[in-house]
């Protein structure tokens, strides 16, 4: 018997953007992905560790999520960090545009990460390498546990700025998860980020679950 799993998708962060930085024709059949460099986040040396949180590793994780989000669209080609010439701390303040154009990048994302008074502060900037100027500056303050969502929100902002289309990375999916033997399947209602991470189960598996339902 064919199984049907119903998936609901809802966006938890909506932003309108009326213009694009770089025109990307998403209607063409054969699209060359836009080369984009996502520089590792610059971490203040005074904030390398905070209550067991390794800030440098956290910054790397945030950059990786942004890269993966861009790559998943097929519209962008995140360049390998091994090719980067400029250090993150210098690039975030004022990039040497010729260094980034040398590796064929057309857009550059830089960032800074620190923790102050128990709050995580993330700064990001988007640079147009052809026009040699900053086009977007973002700053978010949140709890350290919310870092993954902030990475998706930043991805949305940059995606919208580059394409003129609404981003969808800060989206969650509710679905029915199945496990156990074929004769005794256990069904649980679950929710996850659009990239498959941050899975949380909403039911224990002892209730009858057919499809997700929501109260208005």
Q: What name fits each language-model region?
A:
Residues 193-210:
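Multi-bladed beta-propeller domains
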